[in-house]
Each structure stands twice: as structure tokens, then as C-alpha cells.
């Protein structure tokens, strides 16, 4: 079995969304290993020395296997290619990204991919997405991975879930890419950046 991963954003000595990472880590462990003592990530990491944007990568199975702190730079993205895969599964954040990597390799001249499953928009290779019609941001109701930043934005009402098919893309003006490391609003592209 592959290891599971939590990726935590650290900047100015502060770790973000620890409660949501704790929830996902412990619900993953409960699902795969049964009822075991919960782990509190907050007691296991020390963000204080890291002033610049840093990725804290926690690998785990039943227990924590490793904790790494890695300087992080956001990869520039200005174009997306739609790719279809009706069998892809990535409900749990694991080290096994074989299918996603294969799809990413098919991006051709584009910076990233936007994955379509059963005619519904899901995620890019590393980000959840949201679409803006100029008034509201809509997030695909069936992402490949329910990311912690996505959950945070849903709880705050910043984004709302919606069924978004490939035919719906043209109804929107912008797409935002975000994840635990990339804040909402840091990557916003015109809808024309998607190769349909």
C-alpha cells in the first residue's frame, strides 16, 4: 500500500489549516486501519523557523513515517488542456500518483491539465479548481480529491459546489487553481486559457 500524504502550507512561521489536515489524516487512518489513537499534527511539526513559503510534507500510514520541510515555489500556469479519464480514482491523498502523472505527461504544449471524469470537471494535476461567472465562484461537486483548502473555502462560503460539465465551461469567465500550498486567488486564469 502507498503512503498517505498531508501537505501543509507554512509561511511567516505559521502553519495553515491544521485542524482540516488533522481531520483528513485521522479519518484516512480510521478508514484504512480501524479505530486507533488519533494523531495531532500540531504537536509533531514546528513551523516557527520557516519565514518563506515552505511545504511541510507528512508521509504516514498507521503512524507518521516522515516529516519534511521543503522550500516551495508556485509553478506558473497560464494554460490548461482538458484530458478525459473515466476510471481515475484519487479519493485519498497518497504517494501513488501514477494515473495523474500519465495524464499530466499528455498535456502537450499546455502548462497543466484539467481532468474530466464522466463528462464532469474535477481537478488539475495538483489543484482543486473553481469557476467564476463574474459574481460567484463554483467548485466541481465531484473533485478527484477533496482538498483541505477546498473544504476551508466551502465552509467560509467563498466557493459553492456545483455540477460542472465540459459544456458548462463556456458559461464562466475565470478559473482559479488552489490547493494547500496555493492560496485562493493566487492563480486566476481567463476561461479562454482552457483548451476545450
PLM-predicted stretches and their roles:
Residues 117, 125, 133:
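A cytosolic small-molecule/anion-sensing beta-strand core signal
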Residues 1-120, 136, 142-196:
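Conserved alpha/beta cores of soluble small-molecule-handling proteins
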Amino acid at each position: 500500500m502507498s503512503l498517505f500524504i498531508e501537505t501543509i502550507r507554512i509561511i511567516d512561521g505559521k502553519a495553515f489549516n491544521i485542524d482540516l489536515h488533522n481531520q483528513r489524516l485521522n479519518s484516512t487512518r480510521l478508514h484504512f486501519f480501524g479505530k486507533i489513537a488519533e494523531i495531532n499534527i500540531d504537536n509533531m511539526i514546528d513551523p516557527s523557523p520557516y519565514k518563506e513559503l515552505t511545504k511541510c510534507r507528512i508521509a504516514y500510514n498507521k503512524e507518521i513515517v516522515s516529516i519534511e520541510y521543503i522550500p516551495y515555489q508556485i509553478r506558473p500556469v497560464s494554460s490548461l488542456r482538458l484530458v478525459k479519464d473515466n476510471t481515475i480514482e484519487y479519493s485519498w491523498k497518497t504517494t501513488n500518483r501514477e494515473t495523474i502523472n500519465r495524464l499530466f505527461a499528455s498535456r502537450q504544449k499546455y502548462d497543466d491539465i484539467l481532468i474530466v471524469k464522466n463528462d464532469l470537471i474535477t481537478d488539475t494535476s495538483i489543484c482543486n479548481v473553481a469557476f467564476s461567472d463574474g459574481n460567484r465562484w463554483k467548485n466541481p461537486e465531484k473533485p478527484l480529491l477533496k482538498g483541505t483548502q477546498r473544504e476551508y473555502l466551502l465552509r467560509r462560503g467563498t466557493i459553492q459546489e456545483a455540477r460542472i460539465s465540459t459544456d458548462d465551461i463556456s458559461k464562466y469567465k475565470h478559473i482559479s487553481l488552489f490547493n494547500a500550498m496555493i492560496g485562493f486567488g493566487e492563480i486566476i486564469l481567463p476561461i479562454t486559457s482552457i483548451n476545450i
